[in-house]
Amino acid sequence: MSSSSSMECTGNMSAAPLLVLTVAVLAVLASTCAADPEPIQDFCVAVPRAGGEASPAYPGFPCKPASAVVSDDFFFAGLAAAGSTDNPFGASLKPGNVEAFPALNTLGVAINRVDLAPGGVNPLHSHPRAAELVHVITGRMLVGFVSTAGKYYSKVVGEGETFAIPRGLMHFQYNPGNASARAMTVFNSQLPGVVPAATALFGADPEIPDAVLAKSFQVDAEIIKLLKSKFKK
C-alpha cells in the first residue's frame, strides 16, 4: 500500500468515530425534541370511550386489537365541511386530533380546520405540546405570534401559502379580507392541547382573584369584572 493510500485510510478511520458521535447526538436531539413518544409498532388505533372520544392513557391511548382494525379506521371526513362562523368571533375550528380521529394515536400528528368570516378571528391561544403550520386554502389570513422576548412576528398569508408557529407561543389567525377564509393547521402532536389566552385569564374556574388581574394589567378592578362577565361559563 502506498503512503498516500495509507494516509487516506487513516484519515477515514479517524473520521469514523466523529461520524458515529454526530449521528448519535442527532438521534438523541431528535428524540428529545419530539412532541410525542416514538411509536413501537406500525399503528395503534385508539379505543374510543363510550362518549365517542378516545380514552386517555400515557403514552398514547389504548389500542384497538390489530385484528379488528379496518381501512375505514384510517379515514376521517370530519374536516370536509365548514363549521358555523355565526358567533362573536366569526370563527369555526374543527379539530382533527386523536380524540376525533383515533387512527392518529402514536403517529405524532394532528390537523385542524379553521374557517373565518370576514373580520373573524381565531383568538390568541397557545399549544403547549406542539408546533404548528398554518396552510391557507382559500382567502387570506393575518397570522401572528409573540416570542418569549416579546417580539411580534406576523404575515398576511394567501392561498397556498404556509406560516410556521413555534411550540407553546401565543398566536392567532385573523381574516382581514372581505370574503371567507379557510386554513388547515397541522401539528407535530396527536393532542397539541390549547390554552385560550382570554378564557384562561378571565374564565378560569375557580376564578383568578380580581386584585391579581387588576394589578397584573394595571387597570381598575371594575374593568376586570367586565372582562370576566364576557367569559363566564
Curated annotation (Swiss-Prot):
Q: Which cysteines are joined by disulfide bonds?
A: 44-63
Localization annotation: Secreted, Extracellular space, Apoplast
> What does it do?
May play a role in plant defense. Probably has no oxalate oxidase activity even if the active site is conserved.
Q: Could you tell me which PROSITE patterns the record lists for this protein?
A: GERMIN (PS00725)
Coarse class of the primary localization is secreted
Report the gene name. GER7
The alphabetical list of record keywords is: Apoplast, Disulfide bond, Glycoprotein, Manganese, Metal-binding, Secreted, Signal
Instruction: List the SMART domains.
Output: Cupin_1
Q: Which residues form the signal peptide?
A: 1-35
GO MF terms held by the record: manganese ion binding
SUPFAM superfamilies per the record? RmlC-like cupins
Which residue positions carry a glycan here? 178
GO CC annotation: apoplast
Occurrences of domain Cupin type-1 (ranges): 77-225
State the similarity comment. Answer: Belongs to the germin family.
- Per the UniProt record, one Pfam family is Cupin_1
- Assembly: Oligomer (believed to be a pentamer but probably hexamer).
Which residues bind Mn(2+) per the record? 125, 127, 132, 171
- What's the protein name? Germin-like protein 3-7
| Organism, scientific name | Oryza sativa subsp. japonica (Rice)
